[in-house]
């Protein structure tokens, strides 16, 4: 991670850390790095519903125009919508203004290259070096050399038309679908998409006012949708996050269906229809043990990566896999889009329900989730804690006792002085006992008083 770019673009409190002055520089320098080989480069910009989106969009646009780029404003649209349109419209770059599931005061800036994928570490480092350069040596066109800005709000409809082509069913008639749009980027798009497929749509979390994004709604608060599904008698509930790159579902009984379960359902269907490349699914180390056991029972292989959808995508690109994702609901169908896509995932899930004629509770119930417990221990040195002999010893002892019927994962936090201890076992009691046993040793050996 660099000075400005984290694991998912540039993020910070809008107008304090992520200022319009910085956004102007990011637009100018980022635009230059991504478009320097084009004579009249085209850059797309989309945003979620945060109040700060207009301010940052204006600054980014000014920076881009100042290097001679042509800017197309997409308005409110999902992150995967920007990724798809960047490639589909032949743009040199796409930019999304969003902080995803973060609180409203935060915002972020995320770039996509001409292929629709997020930037490489090298490209981000080049942009950062230009931002921090003592002297601005970038082009300063004048007159007709300056860029122009145009609105392309129909981009959202172009994206929805594309999404509809990815499913086998003609429509979802006869199905009642409850949507929770997190008062975010999918608020208009998702409702239109499913209504256009003749579903009976009921919607919550679709009244953005600039301040209520993710507030008690969306994929990080699926309990709100669970109650809504039962109240409305819906067949399925679909919860998106603020920028629309995640999906968490709810079955007809009000049970939450997470990313692992959704991936399992999709992997099984793709294998049955001969479309699962290399019979393999890519997930992160945080996926549930029950997920791997369910895949194994279907003859499906799995590959694990570090936590973060960018690592999942890297692995998929490198080895030619077409399905991957995270328990949190970032699910990537690489045949159709270059990033996690909540609406695309929702379509695939409902498509499978309709084709199989089975309720979501039955489809998701094929995967038995192991109880999972995560405990954080504050330590003086998280890296040294991982090398401590007593810590290593207790982890080995616990793994031996589990004997394949459980799993333990001990790793340093990426952002805080913490060691995260996660265990899965056949019962919650066993889970707690294993986690506390390891946590006690970590506290004793490396903990902060």
Curated annotation (Swiss-Prot):
It comes from the Bacteria. Binds 1 Mg(2+) ion per subunit. Activated by phosphorylation. Mg(2+) binds at residues 100, 241, 243, 245. The modification Phosphoserine is found at residue 100. Transmembrane segments: none annotated. This is Phosphoglucosamine mutase. It comes from Geobacillus kaustophilus (strain HTA426).
